[in-house]
Regions:
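A generic local structural motif
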Residues: 42-46, 71, 91-95, 119-123, ...
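Short alpha-helical oligomerization interface
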Residues: 25-30
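Extended beta-solenoid/beta-helix repeat architectures
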Residues: 207, 211-278
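Short loop/turn motifs at secondary-structure junctions
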Residues: 51-54, 101, 129, 243, ...
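Catalytic-core segments of class I nucleotidyltransferases/pyrophosphorylases
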Residues: 105-106, 113-130, 134, 139-215
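Conserved N-terminal catalytic core of the sugar/cofactor nucleotidyltransferase
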Residues: 1-11, 19, 33, 37-118, ...
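Active-site regions of enzymes building and remodeling cell-envelope glycoconjugates
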Residues: 75-80, 143-151, 247
Length: 278
C-alpha cells in the first residue's frame, strides 16, 4: 500500500509529558512502552501500513530527550530537533517548511495508543479532494465532543496550502487551522474504527497497557518470571519474582519475591508509580 506522492507525514514527539511524571523524567513520552512497544514505534508502524515510510516521506520532531528519540528513529524518518523550546503542533509543521516542500501533511501524535486495523490512516486519504482538513475522531466520554460530534483522535490531514502558511513559532493546530476550517465548513471528522487512548496520565498509560494485554500477560522473551503475573506487561530484561496484577514492568525492572504490586508501573528496582482508581 502506498500513499500519494504529494503527501508526507509529521510525527509529533516533542512533548514534555508533564502529567506523566516521574516516568517522563527518565525518557520522553513518545518512548514510553505500551505492550512492550514504544509509542513512537507504534506511530511509525501505523504510517508505514498507510504507505508512508522513510526519511523522504516521514519526519519526527523532538525536544525533550531529543537524543533518545533520534537514536530510536535511526534512518526511519527525517529528524526535526526543536532545541530551544517545543513549537507546538502547528509550529512543528512550520519548522519543516523546506522538508515538506509544498506537499500535503498528515500530522499524527506519537503519545497516544491506537488499536485499529492496519492501514487505518488510509481512511483520512481515501477520496480526499485535497482542500478540506480532515481529522481522525473518536466518541468522547464527557458528552461534549468538540469536532463534528467526535473528539480528536491524534491524526490530522492538512492540505498543502494550509501547511504552507504555518510559521516556525509556538502555535497549535487547533487555533491556527482546525477552528478556522470548522468555521469555514472545511473540517471533516472521520470516525476512528478502533480504540484511542491518550497516554497523558499514569492512569491512562496503565489503561492503554491493559488494553494491549487483552486480559492476558505480555512477557518479553528474555524476561525472567518465577512469580505470579496477572494481566500484566513484563518488559525485556526484567525479573519478576513476586506477584503483579495489572502492572507494567519497564525494560530491566525487578520485582522481588516478597513484593505484591497491583495497578502499578515498576521502573528499575525502586521506582513504583501506583495508579489509584484504575
Amino acid at each position: 500500500m502506498t500513499a500519494p506522492d504529494d503527501v508526507c507525514a509529521v510525527v509529533l514527539a516533542a512533548g514534555l509529558g508533564t502529567r506523566l511524571k516521574p516516568l517522563t523524567g527518565l525518557r520522553p513520552k513518545a518512548l514510553v512502552p505500551v505492550g512492550n512497544t514504544p509509542l513512537l514505534d507504534r506511530a511509525l508502524h501505523r504510517l508505514a501500513a498507510a504507505g508512508l515510510a522513510g526519511a523522504g516521506r516521514v519526519a519526527v520532531n523532538a525536544h525533550h530527550f531529543a537524543e533518545m528519540i533520534t537514536e530510536q528513529v535511526g534512518t526511519r524518518a527525517h529528524m526535526s530537533i526543536e532545541d530551544k523550546e517545543p513549537l507546538g503542533s502547528a509550529g512543528a509543521v512550520g519548522n519543516l517548511h523546506g522538508w515538506i516542500d509544498g506537499r500535503a501533511v498528515l500530522v499524527i501524535n506519537a503519545d497516544a495508543y491506537v488499536d485499529a486495523q492496519p492501514g487505518d490512516l488510509r481512511e483520512l486519504l481515501d477520496d480526499w479532494d485535497g482542500r478540506t482538513i480532515r481529522m481522525s475522531g473518536h466518541r468522547a466520554d464527557d458528552g461534549h465532543p468538540p469536532f463534528g460530534g467526535l473528539a480528536f483522535a491524534g491524526a490530522s490531514l492538512l492540505p498543502a496550502a494550509d501547511a504552507a502558511v504555518l510559521k516556525p513559532e509556538y502555535s497549535h493546530l487547533v487555533l491556527t487551522t482546525w477552528r478556522p476550517a470548522e468555521r469555514a465548513q472545511r473540517l471533516e471528522a472521520i470516525p476512528l474504527d478502533g480504540t484511542y487512548i491518550d497516554c497523558g496520565t499514569p492512569a491512562d498509560y496503565l489503561a492503554a497497557n491493559m488494553h494491549a494485554t487483552r486480559g492476558q500477560n505480555l512477557i518479553a522473551e528474555d524476561a525472567v518470571v518465577t512469580g505470579a503475573a496477572h494481566s500484566s506487561v513484563i518488559g525485556p530484561g526484567s525479573a519478576m519474582f513476586g506477584v503483579v496484577r495489572r502492572c507494567v514492568l519497564w525494560p530491566g525492572a525487578r520485582v522481588d519475591a516478597d513484593e505484591v504490586l497491583t495497578d502499578a508501573v515498576r521502573v528499575g528496582r525502586d521506582l513504583t508509580v501506583k495508579v489509584t482508581g484504575a
